[in-house]
Each structure stands twice: as C-alpha cells, then as structure tokens.
Amino acid sequence: MLLGLPGHLINDVQAATTTKAVTQGDTLIGADLARNIYDLNGAGITVAVISDSFNCLGGAEIGQANGELPATVTVLKEADCQGEKTLDEGRAMLEVIHDLAPGASLLFHAMGDNPADLTQALNRVADHGAQIIVDDAIYFSEPMFQDGPASQAIDRLVAERGIAVFSSAGNAGLNSYQSVFSDSGTYPLGEKHGVAHDFNPNPRETDTCQTITVGADAFTILSLQWDQPAKSIGGGNGSASDLDVVVYDDPACKRVARTWVIGGSTDNLGGDPVEVVGFDNKGNRHRKTVGLSILKVAGPAPGLLKYILSGSSLPSEHPSIDEYRNAPKTVTSAFGHANAASVFSVGAIEAGHGKKPPAPSYYSSPGGLPVLFDNQGQRLAEPIVRRHVDAVAPTNVNTSFFSKTRPDLEKDGKPNFTGTSAAAPHAAAVAALLLQAEARNGQVLKPIQLYDLLRRSALDMSTPGYDYETGYGLLQPAKAINLLSNDR
C-alpha cells in the first residue's frame, strides 16, 4: 500500500514491469555482506526521508510492485508538485534505503521552501516514530557562521529524543570564496551603490571583478554571507552592514546583467547578513563566463565575507570560480544544518562502475566552516570548527527512475542517482542495520554511540586520518556491527 495524499491509502499497486534496480553502494560498502553475516534487514526501525517530493512524477506504485519500495510508505506531506524543484528525489533516496535495509519502515515528508519548513518536517517525522532521519535539503539563506533554526532543531532531536539525523553535505565542492573585506576605494556603479571589494591579494594592484562560470542549461545559486549575526535567529540588532552582489554579462565587468540574474541587492541593515543570487542559464546549451563584484553599500567593513556557488553535480551543469580561488585545502562549502553540532554529515565518493577505484566526488562539499556566533547572536570567544563531513558513501548509483536525464554510466538501462543526495541515504540505511542489531540485545543505540561506530569503522580515504573532504572515510557496515558486538 502506498500512502499518497495524507490519510489515503492506495491499494491498487500496478503490476511489475521492470527488473529491480539496486544501488551499487550495497556491495561497494559491503552492506550486503553485513545483512547476510549478521542476519539483519532493518526490521523494527523507522527511517524518515525529508527531500523535495515523493510521487510528483508518478510511478511510485510501479516501484512498489517491482520491489523498489516496501508495500507501505507513509507520506506525511507531499510537495505541491509545481515547478522544476519536484523531481521525486525523495523517492530515489527511499529506494536506496530499501536496497540496504529492506525491512525498515519508511516515512517521507516534503522539505518545503525554507528552514522553518525543514524544522517543521523534522519535528513531524519525529512525532511519527522516526528513529533515523535523513535529508538532502539546502536552503541558501541558512546561516554559515551561526546555527539556524534547523540546526537547533536537529540538536534538540538528537539530545532530547535520541533520534539520529543524517544530512547530505552538499554539491558545491571547491566553489567557495572567502576573504576579509578589502576596500578598493573604487565605486564601479557610483558612490550610492557602494565601494567594491578588491579581489586581488597583491597590495600594489586592484581588481574588483572576479570571473565565474555557470553551468550549461542550469540554474546556479550564489549565497554571500559575512561575519555579523542574523536578526532572524537571535534577535538583536541584526546585520550592521549592507553588501550587494553585482553580476555582469561579460567577464570584464562592463555590462550589468539584468535579464537572467535574480537577487543580490537586498537591504541587509538590521536584517540577516546574506545575499542570494540566482543565475538562470536554462535553455543555453553552453556554459557562461561572467564577472561579479561585491559592493559594501553601508555600514562597517565585515571582518570576513564568504560566498558559496552551488549548482548541479553533473559536469556540464556544475559552476566554477575561475580566478582568485582559495587554496583547495582551505575551502569549506558544507553549511547550514549540514554543519549542525549533532548532525552526521555525509559526503560522496564515485561508485567507480568497475572502471576505477572509489574516489571522492569533485562536487562533494568539504566541511570545516567555523561557527562564529552563539544562538543569541553574540560573537564566540573562539570559533567552533566541527568535524563535518563525518564520512562518505557512494554516489552515481542505480535507482529505478531517478533521473532519466542523468547518465547511465554502466549502460545497464538504469539511471544513475548523482550527488551527496545519493550518498546520504546509504548512511541512514547502515544506521538502521546497527539499530536493529542493538535492539536484538534489548538495548537502544544512542545517536552519539551510533555516530562513533560509523566513524571508527570507516575506511580511511584521501589524506591519512580525518580530513574535511572525506571525513573519517568510507562507511563499512560489517565492521561497524562487529565493533558494536565487541563494545558490549
């Protein structure tokens, strides 16, 4: 039975028409071995997915008939199914979980449009019995330097209700720029529009124009923030400065873009220190290189400014920062609730498809972003840098339908699910196996214990030891279950 509209069960499941799709991550991390060796399937554990939509495209009933999903999926809230944001990525995440933990009960809740919607979704799935929650939601207005409402909600669920929360790290990769604000002394649009930031680190030269490239046939988002507290979180006075982002049609910053760029000029004084810019390059088969400037319109110069450039995980649609890039090992682009104190943040590695060993995905967002303010907006005596990303899991894996426009890398007729959105549900499913294993012994595995097992058992990748790109390494469920047995 598929729970479609809230409160309505659909019993007429359609006949099976295709062969079941199974994520390559099942064998790559050895979840299949863990199930067989320890006789586990996630039974008795409830896992909730919070994502864009579940069945806006249709086809969930066929997926159930083919064994892609369990007979009952509880949909607490579906998206409104309008626009391009509803791609049923949530159903793809549920398929991945069902592959690794086929006995687990599954819930779904739409992520909504803003962090307040996510907070509501987190609380609602918790109220309906979720023991594990996984989401792939990104809101570009979420604070970078302060814990927002969703981060605080996650901390409460973990501490007060014992619910483990997993979140995708994001797909920005190395596309982040940060710097102290450097006053160029120039006003490219006139004094009333503000003084431009100087991108050039050479004190004898000035450059107020930075080139970036947005993806082909894609929508790209830039979120600029700076080190001042957000009015919407702790109250208080909010941002003391007003910064704007100006985008130009050309890489030399000669012609201001007006028709295909959205946002960038909010009055931030007394509000939140964030400017969000949308680049609509849909319909253009070519990548587009443009220039941008950052202007201080009013208030004191911030001590630190940072933007993250986010887009698709597909190479042709992925954006890039073309000059004045920060050193790779210093880049941080996992932000918002993916950097919450109590979340388990999941990055991505390539499944390989038999052609190469697993390697970190170029778009997987590294962690390490400092928290500078407390929940009341007071600057901390020392920045808090959390060890996120926690671990990595496979991406470019099979589902039955998501997405038909994505590459079929291994040519098996099954589309590949790409991004850290594909990685995160692997972690949630492994967690379900661990919770089931502990429940057999009459014990409840607390989130802090669960996270510790996943970290200690992970297969180290990249540089030796912990790193912000791959965390503690690749998930290893069989080893985690063995550690659980030894720890008793």
Question: Where do the PLM segments sit?
Answer:
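Loop-rich non-cytosolic ectodomains and luminal regions
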Residues: L2-D487
